[in-house]
Amino acid sequence: MFNGTLERAILETLAYSDVFDYPLRLDELYRYLPIRVEIGKLQQALGLLNEQVGMKDDLCFLTGHEAIIKIRKQREAHSQKLTQRALQYGCVLGSLPFIRMVALTGSLAVMNSSGDADFDYMLVAAPNRVWTARAFALLFNRFTRLFGHTLCPNLIVS
């Protein structure tokens, strides 16, 4: 029997992922737990929580929220379609001489983008070039919007 800490951590983690309609695979639940446990203990605790936690198609979710499985699968399929374009846009941004790194963030980064998703990026700019990087990213966004894609440079650091 557990002291309740692990069970509480499992429920809190699943409740958080539920906000995003994102049931978790066992490995994801293990990774996102705020406490470190052995995978075997996690599986045991899930067995004890069978009235509060459901499991289907290798996904864990809060009981009564089984519909989010379909949502996750739809969003994963949609994200797969967008990923190639997002990588292409990221390569264009990364080719600018004052951009040191481009990282995809947001819902697309975790393959959970809905139909109206934009492309969220984190940019690492050369020293003293944050505003230049932002200006070019916003200018490039004006271009990509012609093709129905919105770029959002959510975080720009130097």
Q: Each predicted region: which residue ranges?
A:
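Helical scaffold of the NTase/Pol beta-like nucleotidyltransferase catalytic core
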Residues: 1-102
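Short, hydrophobic/amphipathic alpha-helical patches that form generic packing surfaces
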Residues: 12-16, 135-141
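Residues in well-ordered beta-strands of folded domains
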Residues: 61, 122, 154-158
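Catalytic micro-motifs at enzyme active sites that drive phosphoryl/nucleotidyl and oxygen chemistry
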Residues: 89-91, 104-112, 140-144
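A structural signal for short, well-ordered beta-strand segments and their strand-loop junctions
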Residues: 101-104, 154-156
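Catalytic metal-binding acidic patch
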Residues: 106, 110-131
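Conserved catalytic core of two-metal-ion nucleotidyltransferases
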Residues: 137-158
